[in-house]
Amino acid sequence: MLALGMFDGVHVGHQAVLNLAVEQANAFAGTAVAFSFPMHPSTLLRPEQAPPLLMNPETKAKHLILKGMQEVILQPFDHEFSQMEATGFVEFLCAHIPSLHTLCIGKNFRFGKNRIGDHLLLQESANAFGLQVLVAESESWGDGPVSSSRIRAALEEGRIGDVNQMLGRKYLMEGMVCSGNAVGRTIGFPTLNLNWNPQAHPCFGVYAGMVKNLRNDQKLPAVANYGVRPTLEKSSCEPLLEIHLLVEPDTEQWRTGIELQMELDFFLRPEKAFAALDDLKAQIQSDKNQALELLSPL
């Protein structure tokens, strides 16, 4: 049972397609397989228009497995593949995937050279090979269907609640704690720093959420700044995720070299430059108080 799609973000719309494949695999004692690409096709065809990805290939594969896929095929999207006519796509799948039974897609699925193929052509082509095609209905949130592009826009605007609803889970920032300049500790707000800079990322600002230590699975509440630290950095620098834990941690378990995973629950404010360090300290304390209040019911 083959689920087809780009699956960037593995949002609730994608999950509807994946669920069809899982249901069919269970019904026919088959295998649920996801077929996707490691990069967006536009990266090759229209690089100036290629959208930033919500997930790298490894993270996408991990989430596809979490949603019930038993195998994940990341087909390289090269020039040769981009020139495949839509009428030859199903034949290609049958030649490369033995015992293919069912194709599961979303209503807006497109395939083949110049994106000519749609769900109707796929059904016609599949019939010739004795395959069935199942089309998942679109999932909606707010004023329209859920899509990766809507999630990217919501991220850029700090609308974390909308992002989490469309993903069907909390948005995650993950990485290894790296050494910092200890300014946070000096001013009374020690931080755990992650060099985290994906293609598509949240707007620079302050967030509240829960942080998970991937070594021991402990979760603690935190407030975090994601950005370029304009008060402290006088020249351009790479974005940094600075996490301040809201409870006193075991410093042996929460330290440099540990992998952390932060889920974003609330956007507090945009990042800004302060005229004086005391102004920054006062704002961080205010952010901390707000985060404690917001996270206490969780």
Model-inferred region functions:
Residues 43-129:
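N-terminal Rossmann-like or analogous alpha/beta NTP/dinucleotide-binding catalytic cores
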Residues 1-56:
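N-terminal catalytic cores of NTP/NDP-binding nucleotidyl/phosphoryl-transfer enzymes
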Residues 126-228:
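Glycine-rich, Lys/Arg-enriched anion-binding loops that position phosphate/diphosphate groups
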Residues 181-298:
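Phosphate/ribose-recognition catalytic cores of enzymes acting on nucleotide-derived substrates
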Residues 34, 74, 135-136:
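A structural preference for short, hydrophobic beta-strand core positions in alpha/beta folds
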Residues 11, 64, 103, 163, ...:
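Residue-level signal for inorganic ion chemistry
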